[in-house]
Regions:
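Alpha/beta-hydrolase fold catalytic core
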Residues: 76-107, 112-117, 123-129
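Bulky hydrophobic/aromatic packing residues
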Residues: 24, 55-63, 92, 129-131, ...
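Mobile gating loops/cap/lid regions near enzyme active sites that modulate substrate access
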Residues: 106-213
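Helix N-terminus capping/helix-initiation residues
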Residues: 2, 31, 75-76, 159
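Substrate-access "cap/lid" subdomains that shape
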Residues: 1-69, 95-117
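A near-ubiquitous, low-amplitude feature marking generic local secondary-structure context
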Residues: 30, 65, 90, 94, ...
Length: 213
């Protein structure tokens, strides 16, 4: 299933409101939907990304009925494709993978591609670092914030590997604020059809994102 197909299905259940982005008249002179339709996304240097397990914390006891309802909006062919892609995961992991793609990853890829069409410099990342004993959370929504701002509170189990990833992320954010490029000496390629991104997980490295789901 393509990124666009997944987003279109999610959009059929979308209701404007809480999750709408602010229209700041600089990066977003209008709603993303309107800008994409008329190819009016402004040219900007943009760094954007998602976390690997955005929604896992919301799915601690997923049932087969829950999963069936989640798949109901897709065609039979699409349901088969999704099941094949996620066959090695348990129900909680399946629900997280699908909803993370619907809510975060696929919209972010579409936004990156729209910016790319407008000749913007686009840099993509995936945050995948997991703290010790975090199997029920993993790389959850918002987990990257203590790394970016180096605010690892005492109650958070923090290893030397976490500190290294934090240093890497701080450096990237500072570089981007200074120059519009988060990398150093070309070590972070711009986003393209190759789907290359920075993977923030010790040891952080450049890698290809899987766009199938």
């Amino acid at each position: 299933m393509s990124t666009l197909e997944l987003v279109e299905k999610a959009d059929s259940f979308y209701k404007p409101g809480y999750n709408d982005p602010p229209i700041d008249r600089w990066l977003l002179p209008g709603s993303p939907r309107e800008l994409h339709v008329r190819k009016g996304v402004p040219r900007r240097s943009v760094m954007l990304g998602t976390n690997e397990h955005e929604n896992l914390m919301n799915y601690a006891s997923t049932t087969k009925s829950d999963w069936t309802r989640q798949l109901a909006k897709y065609s039979e062919q699409q349901r088969t494709q999704i099941e094949q892609l996620l066959e090695d995961k348990n129900l909680n992991e399946k629900m997280d993978a699908l909803t993370t793609a619907e809510d975060f990853f696929c919209p972010t890829v579409l936004q990156a591609n729209a910016l790319l069409e407008g000749n913007s410099d686009v840099f993509m990342y995936r945050f995948a670092q997991e703290r010790p004993n975090s199997k029920s959370l993993r790389a959850y929504h918002g987990a990257e914030l203590p790394y970016v701002f180096d605010t690892h509170d005492e109650w958070l189990p923090t290893t030397s590997e976490d500190r290294t990833v934090s240093k890497e992320m701080k450096t990237a954010w500072i570089n981007f604020a200074r120059s519009g490029n988060p990398g150093e000496d070309g070590d972070w390629p711009e986003w393209s059809a190759d789907a290359i991104a920075m993977i923030f997980r010790y040891p952080s490295m450049i890698g290809e994102l899987d766009l199938k789901l």
